[in-house]
Amino acid sequence: AAFYVGVVTNAAFASIFAANEQRVLRDVRDHEVVHRDFFAAVLGSARIPNLTPNFSSVNFGDRNSVLETARTFEDLGVSAYNGAARYIANLTYLGIAGKIVSVEARHAAAIRDLLAPRTGSFAPKAFDDANSPQTVLNAADPFIVENITAINT
């Protein structure tokens, strides 16, 4: 959520993205904020506390830098939900996770289409990755100041 908030509030946003692209990125931001707030409410004190993002590697004034980073986050999100499903014992929460991962997959496809319109890159594989929590955290590490380790999975 923090990444997309940064994208849409950046001074260059309106100049580097066409109107239809701005709409997509605002929608993705809105979805990610809902997901973040949902997890904060459901997990309560068991959630990962607020993290300090490190977006120093992202040039928010460059369309490709923003979209490449967005693709990284969306693909990582899909792999995180897919990998975490086996740890979710509560069927209600598993169903909700399934609903969220389907939205994340649409985000990934939309971002990929912005990068390479009307090509096969929107869904490059028949099956998405399913990564372990530690693999996901390792991939996210460059974008987070705090050190996070998966325990009790």
Regions found by a protein language model. Give the residues of each.
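All-alpha RGS (Regulator of G-protein Signaling) helical domain and cognate RGS-like helical scaffolds
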Residues: 1-153
